Amino acid sequence: MKIYTLDPRCIPAMEKVREYYLSIPEWQKDIREGKMFGVLIYRPAPALYGGEYDVSESGQYEVTGSPISSAKDDGAPGDEMTSGDALSYLAAFSGTLGGKTCQPGFVPPIFDIQGEGRYFLEEEAEISAINHYLDSGKASAREVCDLRHERKERSRALQRWLFARYSLLNVRGDSANLLDIFSPTIPPGGAGDCCAPKLLQEAFRRGIRPLAIAEWNSADNKFYPPCTHRCRPILAHMLQGTDAEADPELTHYQDIASRLKTIYEDKEIIVVNKPSGLLSVPGKEFLPSVESITQALSTHRLDQDTSGLLVLAKTENIQKDLRQQFAQRAIEKTYDALLEQEMPVGKEGVIELPLRPDIENRPRQIVDHEHGKSALTHYRVIGNINGHAHLLLTPETGRTHQLRMHCAEGLKNPILGDRLYGTREDATSQTLRLNASAITITHPTTGEKMRLTCTPEWLGSQD
């Protein structure tokens, strides 16, 4: 079942849906601004569970209002639906279309906020009334405090009420709501309202076996895979038991995560060697991270592109102790780096350039002597490898991208493979040659001074 790559058999259905929504004048503002649409193609067949599937029902949400063959098995456009040789489809839009959650020709929402969810709209209106009163300036200082607390609690309760009502099926008939699926985090706004979850929900509700799903944006008519921020955790549940193709991005990061190695572990701490490309802590894309894999608590971070040693705690008290050591600069760290150009062996010095985020070009950082935060790095050139200077870097501060910026701006010699600050055209296709190779900590329980080391993977394979 294709969902992350376009199945050609979906194209005729996509064209029929596009022809349909372009014919409705009331929808054209949404269409011009860009609305996600999707189709799910299937072959009418006996249900996977719950009895026989009634083919006559398939027209209920189809664009024409009657069963239509969107493609034959060989990918060619079909004619009328006949037994065994033709496909049909379901269609969906994300969020609302023409200001409504339900429209003829499309599957219904998983939870209809404009119908059965009227309580949400009424409670939302009352919370908005609190906002208007606070903005009016008529509230006393005591009222402001009380109303802000009330607004926060009611908003939180309303959000949980809504998420609990999105009950999502999978092919096995199992159901889970958004709170269960995203636990322990809070689901993002709009979760469950994208095309793929809506299509799968209707298919499983009716016992349809999906063959493929395709989504596209009406603004550019290009195919897009399901979004990661809202859909990845949902699809992990809904696609259980299907033959759906693997999420290629997730598979890629799982391959990277498999290279995570434990350097040291006891009852209080765990020290790992993080490969380049693996997140230190969970992000918005719900990809594997060191924290999620080890089920330990982060005490510091490495950039996603940086490899090397990370120290994690197994309890909150140990985490607090180690974070305090980092804050007090009691922990020593040394990095190996290969730079784009050669440098004289034995050269050493200190780079001190204040840094701040480049607000208009995140996640890049920039040097700012007026508003930047102090950043200091010691460096020493210990050799040249295949035309690239090999440095040992010892930071005294821990600013975002500090070592990358200090090499690029302070030494005018970016780190090899730096896709943000590098000058080589092939930087984006290379591994960042920056590795946290040594760290010295005081064990939170024993008080023992511990020095742990690792060797960069890339030292043995240079361009």
Regions found by a protein language model. Give the residues of each.
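RNA pseudouridine synthases
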Residues: 1-463
